[in-house]
Amino acid sequence: MKFARSGAAVSLLAAGTLVLTACGGGTNSSSSGAGGTSGSVHCGGKKELHSSGSTAQENAMEQFVYAYVRSCPGYTLDYNANGSGAGVTQFLNNETDFAGSDVPLNPSTGQPDRSAERCGSPAWDLPTVFGPIAITYNIKGVSTLNLDGPTTAKIFNGTITVWNDPQIQALNSGTDLPPTPISVIFRSDKSGTSDNFQKYLDGASNGAWGKGASETFNGGVGVGASGNNGTSALLQTTDGSITYNEWSFAVGKQLNMAQIITSAGPDPVAITTESVGKTIAGAKIMGQGNDLVLDTSSFYRPTQPGSYPIVLATYEIVCSKYPDATTGTAVRAFMQAAIGPGQEGLDQYGSIPLPKSFQAKLAAAVNAIS
C-alpha cells in the first residue's frame, strides 16, 4: 500500500486485509472521474462490505476504498488481497460480497453457473483495474532498449542468448549493445503476471514463442525468483539480466524499462497513462450484455499507433441482482466510487485511469447492479 490518507483510518492486517473507514455519518453524493467521465455515487445499503481476491488490485483498491468512504461517510469496505483464486472461491461460497480477480469467471469449470446459484442472478465480470507489465532490464552502459514481440519471445525462450544479437541490434540502431550473455529472470511462483506476459509473447511473436501461457513460466531458461520483489532484486544485482514486472514495481525500484515496437507501427512505445489508455479504449468485449469479459488478444497486436501492448486487466466479479437488496445498493455505490472519483491519481498506485470511452461502458453496467 502507498500511504494513509487524512480523514480516514487505514489498517493493514497481517493477512493483507485493507480496512478504511471514513469519519462522519449519513449519505453523500459526489461526481468525478479522472478519465473524464463524471458520475454520481448514490450511497446507501448496508454499512460494511466485504471483498477479497487479486493482489494485483491491492494498491488500486486502497484508492477505490478511499473514494468510497469520502463519497459515503459511515460506509466501509474490507478488502483481503488473498489471491484471485481464493477471492473467487469465497465469493462463490457467499463469504464475500464481490471478488477481485485477474481472470473472469471460467465456464470450463462451471464458475458462471455456480455464481448464478450464489447470486440468484447472473454474475458480471467488470474489468476495473488495468496495470501495465514492464519488461525490465539491467545491461551495463545501456539506458534505452527497444524490443518487439518476436525478439522478446526469442529472448525468453532461449533462442537469443547475447545482447548484441543482430535481431536485437536491428531494433536499436545508434545503441552499441555489448556481447554480454542474456540472463533471463522469471517468476518462480504462480502468477497472473506470468500468465499475461506469456499471452503477450504468444500473441505478438508470430509463432516465435511456442510455449503457450500459464501462471507458471514456460520458457525453459533462466533463473526464478518469487514475486515482483524477488525478480526486481535479482535483476538489480545481475548484469545482462531481463525480466517482467508490474509497472508499479518497475517505477518504485527505478528499473530500466524497454520500449515496445508493436504491430501498429515502427515507433517504440513506452508505458504512459496515454499509451495504456489507448490500449484500454481499444479493448474488445466478448461478453454479453453487462458481462464485460475482454478479448485481451486485442491488446497484444494493437492497430492504433502508440498503444502499449502488455496490460493486465483485472475484474470485479459482482452479482447483477443481489438476494439482499441492501448489499446490491452498497456494491453499486462502491463501484460508482471506484470508476468515478477513485480514478483520480490512480497512476500513482501502478494502475491506469480509465479512458472516457471505456469508463462510459463500465458505468452502464455498474449502474445496473441491484
UniProtKB/Swiss-Prot annotation:
List of residues binding phosphate: S54, T55, A56, S84, D102, S191, G192, T193
Q: Name one GO molecular function term.
A: phosphate ion binding
Q: Got a GO cellular component term for this one?
A: extracellular region
Protein's name according to its UniProt entry: Phosphate-binding protein PstS 2
Keywords from UniProt, A to Z, are: Cell membrane, Lipoprotein, Membrane, Palmitate, Phosphate transport, Signal, Transport, Virulence
In what way does this protein cross or attach to the membrane?
Lipid-anchor
Give the multimer and partner information.
Answer: The complex is composed of two ATP-binding proteins (PstB), two transmembrane proteins (PstC and PstA) and a solute-binding protein (PstS).
Family annotation (SUPFAM superfamilies): Periplasmic binding protein-like II
Chief site of localization? membrane
Q: What happens when the gene is disrupted?
A: No growth phenotype in phosphate-rich medium (3.6 mM Pi). In restricted medium (Sauton) grows better than wild-type even after nutrient starvation. Decreased phosphate uptake in phosphate-depleted medium. Decreased growth in infected BALB/c and C57BL/6 mice for up to 5 months after infection.
Give the similarity note: Belongs to the PstS family.
Compartment list: Cell membrane
Residue positions of S-diacylglycerol cysteine lipidation? Answer: C23
Tree of life domain: Bacteria
List this protein's GO terms for biological process: phosphate ion transmembrane transport; phosphate ion transport
User: What residue stretch is flagged as signal peptide?
Assistant: 1-22
Lipid moiety-binding residues (N-palmitoyl cysteine): C23
Induction of its expression = Transcription not induced by phosphate starvation, protein levels do not increase either (at protein level). Part of the pstS2-pknD operon.
What's one Pfam family the UniProt record gives for this protein? PBP_like_2
Record flagged with keyword Cell division: no
Its biological purpose: Functions in inorganic phosphate uptake, although probably not the main uptake protein under phosphate starvation. Part of the ABC transporter complex PstSACB involved in phosphate import.
Concerning PROSITE patterns, the annotation shows:
PROKAR_LIPOPROTEIN
List the PANTHER family.
Answer: PHOSPHATE-BINDING PROTEIN PSTS
